Amino acid sequence: MMNMKEDKKNTMDMKNMKHHDERKKLNSSQGKNEIIFPEVAESKKDNNGYKNYTLKAQEGKTEFYKNNFSNTLGYNGNLLGPTLKLKKGDKVKIKLINNLDENTTFHWHGLEINGKVDGGPSQVIKPGKEKTIKFEVNQDSATLWYHPHPSPNTAKQVYNGLSGLLYIEDSKKNNYPSNYGKNDLPIIIQDKTFVSKKLNYSKTKDEDGTQGDTVLVNGIVNPKLTAKEEKIRLRLLNGSNARDLNLKLSNNQSFEYIASDGGQLKNAKKLKEINLAPSERKEIVIDLSKMKGEKISLVDNDKTVILPISNKEKSSNKGNTPKVSKKIKLEGMNDHVTINGNKFDPNRIDFTQKLNQKEVWEIENVKDKMGGMKHPFHIHGTQFKVLSVDGEKPPKDMRGKKDVISLEPGQKAKIEVVFKNTGTYMFHCHILEHEENGMMGQIKVTN
């Protein structure tokens, strides 16, 4: 027969179990901010056939809410990290740099590699130190991820921003969407709590698993997704510290479940709901071709909106725009401004073009984790024609001959450029302080 002491202990245990299983209320996304997608990490192949990457764990600042900057962590940036795209058979070499003020490791979650380079707690890289690892990819296509794994600071470092995706790309042809950032979309779902609109792990930490009240997708608060009327592939990662997700579409539409943690299924499954545990990945394909302006949402537990999805029609001009020959990426704010990652160098010619030759330039104002700002882009010595903005016909006030085009963060335009004279000309942001801080390049026009 149970005595009173044992009965009291069991009652307390039951209360604790109930408490541990409770989910903190998660507020729905208001759908105010378009999500952005992590950049794809660049690699260089060396003479031994290795693809060389560099990943740097570093401190940063992120404006989750306007004019409120949080201290965050990121790989090669302020928050999260670039996507590594690998293929089966690739030989890979990665320089790992710790620019934090505490120990960290680089763990390759789901990657089947030698334990010496797995990045567990015993493989610490001290502050200010670096090391280089090598491995060969020996598994089929899958969506994996990388994150720190130091003891005892894994939870804190992941919560503050250290996460990134690693793709082993499709090894065989299939009909799944594969255009990164267009219809093949990396979706990192996390939950966090903000204190006075700022991230503060120490004030929100829970030893039984930290859950937040605010949903983020790819580091964006109140996220939304605008997609074309076509099939889209969502590579879902539950990057939360502790929250389980039960995901479905708000209109109860079915979708194709095509891949689990370990890779693609032999046969896709038609489902209406999936569970996603912390660190788990699943890939689904949603058919938006019949939406015709309808709005749906990816929801958790039937009610909490994780990601509103709205529809934009396919461009009627698809295929009519000539091939792009030059790409311009405008990035940054203040004195951290660049064009294609470079500061102006008077001794460097960035592009060349033939006299009287029509070329199409693609101008992109990159929206980063700080949000970015509008940049007016100017080319010397010519007048150009705006062909499209974000794949659509340009607005009426952008038509006619122009020498300046102003783009909001995240916007991308195509312009037709012809030079009628030879020589070396400048192209730059026409915010004068940005120009003087190096947001400028040179093009040489020859016969």
Swiss-Prot record:
Cysteine disulfide links: none
Group of enzyme by EC: oxidoreductase
GO molecular function annotation: copper ion binding; oxidoreductase activity
Biased composition (Basic and acidic residues): 1-25
Binding site for Cu cation 3: 149, 380, 428
Compartment(s) where it occurs, according to its Swiss-Prot or TrEMBL record: Cytoplasm
Residues binding Cu cation 1: 107, 378
Any one Gene Ontology cellular component term annotated for this protein: cytoplasm
Annotated cofactor note: Binds 4 Cu cations per monomer.
Metal-binding among keywords: yes
Cofactor list: Cu cation
Pfam entry (one): Cu-oxidase_3
SUPFAM superfamilies given in the database record: Cupredoxins (SSF49503)
Positions with a binding annotation for Cu cation 2: 109, 147, 430
Function according to Swiss-Prot or TrEMBL: May be involved in copper homeostasis and oxidative stress response.
The protein's name in its UniProt record: Multicopper oxidase mco
Species classification: Bacteria, Bacillati, Bacillota, Bacilli, Bacillales
